[in-house]
Amino acid sequence: MLEVSILDKRWHSITKDPQSFVLNIINASLKELKIDHYKPNISIALADDNLLHQLNLKFREIDKPTNVLSFPCEQLSSECDLGDIAIAVDTIERESHEYCISILTHTAHMLVHGLLHLLGYDHQKEDEEIIMKSLESKILALLEFEKEKYGR
């Protein structure tokens, strides 16, 4: 089961139905990765910088907010508790302006990025980063978000 918690009302100004937007992105990603049949349990929190700052400090000892955090729980298996994803509206908005992309595109990217972390993908080493970015691009292209390139 996928559970979306909207913890900051500003998400409603980004998309009319934030819950459906998130569910569509995650479900399409699971399908593209050919793991939708596992029906994993994932909780997604649409939050703000304050919460992600607290979580980042507590779990990563980094004293600042970030765009997305993932907290893996179990290995992928049928109806497992795959983990939690939290996204900060403030950072997403700020980075969207910096990168000259839409907030929805950046949100979709961070949802896919967070999901891949739950599945064990990482980007600490160059070879891992190449694999993870390739999967992100493939999924975002399927969702028709890859057309809008990051202006970095």
Curated annotation (Swiss-Prot):
The record's InterPro entries line, in alphabetical order, gives:
MetalPrtase_cat_dom_sf_prd, YbeY, YbeY_CS
Specify the enzyme's EC class, one word: hydrolase
Give the record's GO CC terms.
cytoplasm
Report the domain of life of the source organism: Bacteria
Q: Would the keyword Hydrolase turn up in this protein's UniProt record?
A: yes
| Assigned keywords, A-Z | Cytoplasm, Endonuclease, Hydrolase, Metal-binding, Nuclease, Ribosome biogenesis, rRNA processing, Zinc
EC number(s) stated in the UniProt entry for this protein: 3.1.-.-
Cite the binding residues for Zn(2+): H113, H117, H123
User: What does the record list as GO biological process?
Assistant: rRNA processing
- Compartment(s) of residence: Cytoplasm
An example Gene Ontology molecular-function term = zinc ion binding
**Predominant localisation class:** cytoplasm
| Cofactor info, note text | Binds 1 zinc ion.
Cofactor(s) needed, names only, are: Zn(2+)
* NCBIfam families, A to Z: rRNA maturation RNase YbeY (TIGR00043)
UniProt similarity note: Belongs to the endoribonuclease YbeY family.
Outline what the protein does: Single strand-specific metallo-endoribonuclease involved in late-stage 70S ribosome quality control and in maturation of the 3' terminus of the 16S rRNA.
This chain belongs to the protein called Endoribonuclease YbeY
Source organism per UniProt: Wolbachia pipientis subsp. Culex pipiens (strain wPip)
